[in-house]
Structures are given as C-alpha cells and as structure tokens.
Amino acid sequence: YANESVDYSKFADDVVFRGTLLGSPDSLNLDQIKGIHKEFFAKYDVKHMAPFNYLQGVNPQTGQADESVRMYYQMQVTNTTNGKSVVIPIYESFDFNEEGKAVFVQWYSDWTASIESIE
C-alpha cells in the first residue's frame, strides 16, 4: 500500500471491506476499494512508520485461535498538493478463506478527520 501498489489477487472476488470512512456505505466491495485507492493515490503519499506486527486472531464465539490476523500500525499520509502530513494510528483485521484469500477486511481509525486535517 505504501508503494501505491496493492496486490488485489490476495483478495477473494466477494471480499467485504468495512471501515470508518465518514459517509461511506456500511460495507464496500473490491471494485469500490480499487476506485477509492485510485483517487487516494493520485493525491497522497503513504509511509508506514514501523514494520507490521501481525497478531493471531481469535474466534469471538469460541475464544479459539482462527485463520484471521489482526494488526496495529501507524501510517504517515502526506498531501502531495500542499506537503502537509499526518500520522494515523490504525487497527486492521483480515479473515481468510481456505484458499488463503482475504474475505473480510475491517479497519478502525479516525481516517476522515485525519485526512481532513491535511487539506
């Protein structure tokens, strides 16, 4: 993502994305995410602030480890038109199918306010 290059083959065709974007639908599909990425990368540069620390996910019903992954990270976003930057703390999780492709992706951050702060 930081290289403005997302390998969309890592996602199932029917993947569901859920995030915290003000005004966006409750869930987004892969084509919608591709469009959002295209617009975003046209205006912003991204830098991850540290290596990712992946954590084993847990099934909320059983309390047992499952095939999901969670992670916390910080991403610096720079508006290329004015040079302003913000560091956004993000929590993200991925659930995978038997083929190892992401079927559900969710993230939590104050994304909308953070991006607005660098406009």
Language model features with spans:
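C-terminal and inter-domain tail/linker signature
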Residues: 1-119
